[in-house]
């Protein structure tokens, strides 16, 4: 007798084969049989009129913090995702020494666009090692979790805050390799690294200070275990992206490890990039490199506010200077006619960062207080047309 039988559903097995009516039997945590005439189950579910299919695996998430208070990884589970892979882009919440919690929290919130109020309300730091982090979230999990360990966290754990300023010494490189081994022993699926992330102070994240020699030493450990490496390349520039592919191909071949790049997406700001990247991946695959790119399947949207510097304005020095001056100074600058005109003009001429196709006119107000609360849901373009001013001035108001 099976533990569970899902009967009479439209079975899509995930292979691309034609969907057929049938049943699926489960024993313990594994599928035991798929077919039309299966034996009885201790529990049976009538799936008539429904689809029985494998859950999606989401290979690029940042649920590291959310899983500490939401074991279902809402809303992913609601959309058919049954396995998440957090810890991408060199960022995880472990291993982490207590004295570095404030730094990591600020950096994590900046990069993942998380409100400090939500982060602080939900997160209770009770761990230092990767295993302790895993143990703290395991009882709450209602979704399969296969986390990577972040290269930046390994460096922060071994080098401390010096990891933000320099490469590792030979002794530190060996300690980093030992730390990675421990994390893999404690449940990490693999490792992630980044060549482009910046922290809350707009400085490179720690892994960007690593040498290729350090990365090679860590890939040696991944090769010992047959574990993957996730890489965040300079995805907005085809030349830089292809250079990273060539570098990572050497590591993949040398250590016989799979390496995945994310994200890869098409944008009007960088025509032809996807084709060049896929051609370079194919060329390196022919040499024996195990490389895959994760293609973005939906538009990227961004949420930002004016309480501090953010990625949207990172290519606009005038805006960055004002936003980093503090709330009072920002309000004063926004009220000055000359500054308003200069900032508005800058939004018309500055290149967008990260190959974003960004339009102030189409930007919508999602939250506001006071008089502006009545404008929530409307675009800056609509409001600018009504007031006869530049959309950037609406934003400043």
Segments from the language model and where they lie:
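Di-metal (Zn2+ and/or Mg2+/Mn2+) metal-binding site signature of metallo-dependent hydrolases
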Residues: 51-75
């Amino acid at each position: 007798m099976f533990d569970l039988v899902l009967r009479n559903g439209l079975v899509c097995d995930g292979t691309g084969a034609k969907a057929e009516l049938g049943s699926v039997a489960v024993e313990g945590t594994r599928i035991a049989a798929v077919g039309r005439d299966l034996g009885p189950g201790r529990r049976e579910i009538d799936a008539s009129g429904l689809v029985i299919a494998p859950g999606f695996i989401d290979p690029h998430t940042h649920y590291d913090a959310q899983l500490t208070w939401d074991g279902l990884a809402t809303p992913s589970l609601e959309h058919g995702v049954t396995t998440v892979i957090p810890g991408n882009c060199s960022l995880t919440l472990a291993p982490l020494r207590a004295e570095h919690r404030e730094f990591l929290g600020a950096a994590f919130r900046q990069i993942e666009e998380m409100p400090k109020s939500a982060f602080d309300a939900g997160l209770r730091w009770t761990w230092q090692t990767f295993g302790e982090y895993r143990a703290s979230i395991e009882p709450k999990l209602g979704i399969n979790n296969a986390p990577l360990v972040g290269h930046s966290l390994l460096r922060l754990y071994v080098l401390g805050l010096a990891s933000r300023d320099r490469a590792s010494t030979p002794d530190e490189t060996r300690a980093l390799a030992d730390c990675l081994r421990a994390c893999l022993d404690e449940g990490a699926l693999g490792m992630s690294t980044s060549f482009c992330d910046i922290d809350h102070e707009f400085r490179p994240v720690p892994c960007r200070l690593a040498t290729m020699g350090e990365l090679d030493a860590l890939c040696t450990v991944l090769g010992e275990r047959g574990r993957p490496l996730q890489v965040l390349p300079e995805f907005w520039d085809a030349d830089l992206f292809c250079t990273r592919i060539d570098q990572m191909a050497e590591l993949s071949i040398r250590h016989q490890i799979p390496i995945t790049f994310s994200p890869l997406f098409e944008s009007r700001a960088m025509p032809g990039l996807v084709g060049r990247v896929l051609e370079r991946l194919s060329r390196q695959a022919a040499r024996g490199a195990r490389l895959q790119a994760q293609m973005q399947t939906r538009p990227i949207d961004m949420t930002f506010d004016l309480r501090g510097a953010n990625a949207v304005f990172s290519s606009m020095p005038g805006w960055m200077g004002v936003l980093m001056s503090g709330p009072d100074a920002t309000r004063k600058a926004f009220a000055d006619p000359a500054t308003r005109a200069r900032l508005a003009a800058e939004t018309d001429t500055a290149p967008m960062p990260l190959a974003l196709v960004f339009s102030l006119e189409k930007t919508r107000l999602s939250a506001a207080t006071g008089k502006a609360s009545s404008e929530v849901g409307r675009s800056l373009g609509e409001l600018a047309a009504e007031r006869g001013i530049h959309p950037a001035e609406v934003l400043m108001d």
